[in-house]
Amino acid sequence: MLRVVVCVSGGGTNLQAIIDAVADGTITNTELVGVISNNYGVRALERAEKAGIDAKVVSPKDYENRAAFNEGLLTTIRAYKPDLIVLAGFLVVIPEAMIEEYENRIINIHPSLIPSFCGTGYYGCLLYTSP
């Protein structure tokens, strides 16, 4: 059984698609073991709860600095012992240590062409005003 952690920042529509695909058997041999959000009170957390998936918030606002946040994020992920991490609308630059530790085990769902439309400011209206 593939153990999957999904990282989210907002509404969780991609998360819901994954939940539904696992539930209906489209995605097989997979267990969604955790959802991690960098924001409190987002709909993705409700979706996880409704599906019976453990969910945690690891917010940069709860840490003194970026290094402490990065370590908190990694510690939370490690606790789930994932085989795969899905970044489903996760609006955080992930730490290099995470990329190294989970090499070839991270999938990023990005709503636009990379690298043309990504980075700070491209979430929301800026995307629609770009060339």
Show which residues each predicted segment covers.
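N-terminal Rossmann-like dinucleotide-binding module
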Residues: 1-43
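Glycine/small-residue-rich loop that forms an oxyanion/phosphate-binding "nest" at active or ligand-binding sites
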Residues: 70, 74-77
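Short, surface-exposed acidic-centric catalytic microdomains
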Residues: 30-58, 63-68
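N-terminal glycine-rich "phosphate-gripper" loop used for MgATP/nucleotide binding
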Residues: 37-38, 61-62, 66, 80-96, ...
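Conserved small/polar residues in nucleotide/adenosyl-binding loops
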Residues: 128-131
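Alpha-helical oligomerization interface recognition
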Residues: 86-126
